[in-house]
Amino acid sequence: MEPAALIHLLDEYFTKFDELAVAHGMEKLKTIGDAYMCVGGLPETNRTHPIDACFMGLAMQAFAEQMKRQRDKFRLPSLELRVGVHTGPVMSGIVGKHKFTYDIWGDAVNIASRLETNGTPGRVNVSESTHHRVKELFVTEARGTIDAKNKGQLAMFFVNRIKPEFSADAEGRVPDERFQSRRSGVASASSQWPTIPAATS
């Protein structure tokens, strides 16, 4: 792919991800090459961020699938997407002198990055910490462990869809009223740690 075409394609994906971040209450942090990073539960604290981050991850993959179908019709290349999500403690703040940047630091950021790197294209790969907070509402799939530096073995799970009993559509992407009711209860039991979705194409 020509550089100009690649930049245009990345812009199309990242513009959509920006829209999804706003829709799901996530805070965009940065893009690094073809990677997109955002956080939930910061800078304004809330208790729904693990659920919101998984929703955004599923929505990102749905968009990537849609783009592939559209571009396949014209035999154009598309991007495959890996999404990694982790919930854990971080430090956050604004840094810089001429270009102010809101950013986060900590082991949780590194774990989210490892989850993305060890993810599978087309899937949402989450940590045990995130899985614990969303498993009542989403269909999940255990997928083994990876070795995380200074953390030992890190369990990973795929988040596949909303559970059928809480879904308003066949694909498990639209929540129904029962989901929203349960969401409040699940969220109130969640910690205040932020959730970090990281994606790369």
Task: Write out the residue ranges for each language-model feature.
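Catalytic NTP-binding/metal-coordinating core of nucleotidyl cyclase/transferase enzymes
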Residues: 1-55
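Residue-level signature of catalytic and energy-coupling elements of molecular machines
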Residues: 17, 33, 60, 85, ...
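Catalytic core regions of nucleotide second-messenger enzymes
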Residues: 24-32, 63-84, 145-146
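A short glycine-enriched loop-to-beta-strand structural element that forms part of the catalytic core
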Residues: 39, 77-93
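Conserved, well-folded catalytic cores of nucleic-acid-processing
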Residues: 60-63, 67-70, 97, 118-122, ...
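Catalytic/regulatory signature loops of cyclic-dinucleotide turnover enzymes
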Residues: 68, 86-87, 107-128
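Short, surface-exposed loop/helix-turn segments at secondary-structure junctions
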Residues: 73, 95-105
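Cytosolic regulatory/linker segments at or just downstream of nucleotide-handling modules
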Residues: 90-92, 118-201
